């Protein structure tokens, strides 16, 4: 689950709340099941740009392919040939989510196969540079012996319905699947099914026969998909022993408008104002049209926002404010109670913040090809049909928020809760940092490993970076004109009613205020705690680039780019962090993500910010000599020569 924090923490004494270090998430954990014990192993390798072997022969220019992702005699062929050369004995398939990003890098993803069956946690991503040659690549392919027996010949595996029952029983899922009612209906693909006749899940469960790389070998498994709201799970059930689960992935991480405008993080920072046509006009449409019609409510191409007091799965027919004149102005004050009395204002604020963030990210490169959230992709690549479902005042929980990120083409889902640590209780929709944090989970999951692969942040350190990226973007966006590198920021301070926020340390460039170092991740099992470390490093990066390039006008929404490069340090930091997500391998660690950010800057600015980036990471122990080991990391403050 990619929630903002732990709902259970707010029940603890305030002295404990000041320094939360462990997660007590809702959902599965309420049923006494710890799904974190089923995490995928972290086995990816990343070959950064300056370590790629020299390439001879012809190349093509990625920019010459334009927006056409269907052309095959180009970067896809180059990537395929590189895989063949690197791993000549491997069998694999091309994932269909390849694209050329707006930074000129072609991103191509492959999945390893055995006997025509996916090895589900094996990925090979190749990044093709502007010169048409391999820029960098990541690899988690299995290099051991492939089972000689083809399971499709003897068909010595269990029925998918039995696997569904196994997942339900082992994880204690709130799904009913009576044997006499459940039918496994074949869908496109080998041994791929959708279950009909179940109840309790938000959509029909699914199952696909796959191999899983585990403990140095391959295990044949049923990948069972169940969306139960607070958890949207991929459960890898042994294909011969349905009482055994090998691994679990959770997709969930949580006109005219009167709103707190962009840059105002919460009601303590400013007042609500009326904004006229706030969308960024360089984009193709406004927020209330999707190519099929206009919606005089909080619905459009990028998002659909509504209240959800029951916490149920339905959303299309839920209440949302309507205005034939597109005037969304509704009363709200911090003293109003109960939250339902200002639901119109809450839904409008959530719709506004999410749409602005969508537009900013679009300019920075998170567009249709990269797997963004839109119903209509306007023939610009990617898969449409996937706006963000935004639930205001969701009744399925309190003191939290989460975001579910299925693969491209399926809607993301944000659940925003109320917070009861103050009187009156507070609505998380009015704290922009929470909304941005949650939406960023959708961004990092779509970019890492490619838009069609939403399990690439499922390892512990990868998931921690997911939380860190979310905190980083929320913090970078709330900067004020007078801020300097000595300015500190919290996360979730207003909603939680806690002056120090919901993280162990504030985001600060002071090692006294925030002493976090890379090796502090040793022994941590909470993704939020690990994320606090990663975001602390990115906060150093942010200020190093601002000190070099300036903040720009933080009162303006639109990033200013010149030749595709942001002109200010704030948006430049955001841009290279986004680009780094697309470059890094599936299931990355801190060292690999650092190298991908350096590579992103190398591609975007020819490495002109190399030293600023290295100094940010080295300051907090992720220097040249840093080494990842899950139980015992090696820290380093060393800088490369020339820095």
From Swiss-Prot:
Q: Which compartment or compartments is the protein found in?
A: Secreted
Q: Which Pfam families match?
A: FTP (PF07504), Peptidase_M36 (PF02128)
- Keyword Metal-binding assigned to the entry: answer is yes
Q: What class of enzyme is it?
A: hydrolase
Q: Which residues form the signal peptide?
A: 1-18
Q: Which cofactor does it need?
A: Zn(2+)
Compositionally biased intervals (Low complexity): 61-73
Summarize where Zn(2+) binds, as residue positions.
Answer: 437, 441
The annotated active site, in chain numbering, is: 438
GO terms for cellular component: extracellular region
Glycosites? 271, 420, 603, 629
Region described as Disordered: 47-73
Q: Which PROSITE patterns match?
A: ZINC_PROTEASE
Q: What coarse category fits the chief subcellular location reported for this protein?
A: secreted
Q: Does the keyword Mitochondrion apply?
A: no
A GO molecular function term, named singly, is: metalloendopeptidase activity
Quote the biased-composition stretches of kind Basic and acidic residues, using this chain's numbering: 47-57
The UniProt note on the cofactor reads as follows:
Binds 1 zinc ion per subunit.
Query: What turns on this gene?
Result: Expression is strongly increased during growth on protein-rich medium. Expressed at even higher levels when keratin is present in the protein-rich medium.
Q: Name one GO biological process term.
A: proteolysis
* EC assignment: 3.4.24.-
The family annotation for this protein states: Belongs to the peptidase M36 family.
Record protein name field = Extracellular metalloproteinase 4
Please report the organism this UniProt entry assigns to the protein. Answer: Trichophyton rubrum
């Amino acid at each position: 689950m990619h929630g903002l924090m732990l709902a259970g923490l707010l029940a603890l004494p305030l002295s404990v709340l000041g320094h939360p270090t462990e997660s007590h998430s809702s959902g599965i954990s309420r049923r006494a099941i710890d799904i974190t014990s089923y995490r995928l192993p972290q086995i990816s390798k990343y070959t950064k740009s300056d370590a790629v072997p020299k390439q001879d022969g012809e190349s093509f220019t990625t920019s010459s392919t334009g927006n056409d992702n269907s052309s095959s005699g180009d970067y896809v062929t180059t990537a395929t040939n590189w895989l063949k050369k690197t791993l000549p004995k491997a069998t694999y398939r091309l994932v269909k989510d390849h694209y050329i990003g707006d930074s000129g890098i072609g991103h191509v993803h492959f999945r390893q196969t055995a006997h025509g069956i996916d090895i589900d946690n094996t990925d090979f991503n190749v990044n093709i540079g502007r010169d048409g040659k391999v820029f960098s690549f990541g690899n988690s392919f299995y290099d051991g012996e492939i089972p000689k027996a083809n399971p499709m010949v003897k068909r010595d595996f269990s029925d998918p319905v039995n696997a569904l029952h196994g997942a339900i029983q082992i994880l204690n899922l709130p799904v009913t699947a009576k044997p006499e009612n459940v039918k496994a209906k074949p869908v496109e693909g080998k041994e791929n099914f959708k279950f009909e006749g179940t109840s309790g899940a938000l959509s029909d469960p699914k199952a696909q026969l796959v191999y899983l790389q585990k403990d140095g070998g391959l295990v044949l498994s049923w990948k069972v998909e169940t969306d139960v709201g607070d958890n949207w799970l991929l459960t890898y059930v042994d294909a011969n022993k349905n009482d055994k689960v090998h691994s679990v992935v959770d997709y969930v991480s949580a006109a005219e408008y009167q709103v707190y405008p962009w840059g105002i993080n919460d009601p303590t920072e400013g007042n609500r104002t009326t904004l006229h046509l706030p969308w960024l006009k360089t984009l193709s449409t406004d927020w209330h049209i999707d190519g099929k019609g206009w919606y005089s409510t909080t619905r459009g191409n990028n998002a659909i926002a509504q209240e959800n007091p029951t916490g149920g799965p339905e959303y299309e027919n839920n209440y949302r404010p309507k205005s034939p004149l597109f005037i969304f102005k509704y009363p709200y004050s911090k003293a109003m109670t109960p939250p339902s009395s200002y639901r119109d204002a809450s839904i409008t604020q959530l719709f506004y913040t999410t749409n602005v963030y969508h537009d900013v990210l679009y300019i920075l490169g998170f567009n249709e090809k990269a797997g963004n959230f839109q119903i209509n992709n306007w023939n610009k690549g990617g898969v449409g049909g996937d706006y963000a479902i935004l639930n205001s005042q969701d009744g399925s929980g309190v003191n939290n928020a989460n975001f579910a990120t299925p693969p491209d083409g399926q809607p993301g889902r944000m659940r925003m809760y109320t917070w009861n640590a103050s009187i009156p209780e507070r609505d998380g929709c009015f704290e922009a940092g929470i909304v941005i944090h949650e939406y960023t989970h959708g961004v990092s999951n779509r970019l890492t490993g490619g838009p069609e692969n939403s399990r690439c942040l499922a390892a512990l350190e990868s998931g921690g970076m997911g939380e860190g990226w979310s905190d980083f973007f929320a913090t970078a966006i709330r900067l004020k004109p007078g801020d300097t590198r000595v300015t500190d920021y919290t996360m979730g301070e207003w909603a939680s009613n806690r002056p120090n926020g919901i993280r162990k340390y504030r985001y600060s460039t002071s090692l006294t205020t925030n002493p976090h170092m890379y090796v502090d991740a040793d022994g941590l099992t909470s993704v939020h705690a690990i994320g606090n470390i990663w975001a602390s490093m990115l906060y150093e990066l942010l200020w190093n680039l601002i000190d070099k390039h300036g903040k720009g006008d933080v009162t303006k929404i639109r990033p200013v780019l010149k030749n595709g490069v942001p002109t200010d340090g704030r948006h430049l930091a955001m841009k290279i962090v986004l680009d780094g997500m697309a470059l890094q391998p599936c299931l990355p660690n801190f060292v690999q993500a650092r190298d991908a950010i350096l590579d992103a800057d190398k591609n975007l600015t020819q490495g002109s910010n190399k030293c600023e980036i290295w100094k940010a990471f080295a300051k907090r122990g992720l220097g040249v000599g840093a080494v990842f080991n899950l139980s015992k990391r090696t820290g380093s403050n060393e800088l490369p020569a020339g820095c």
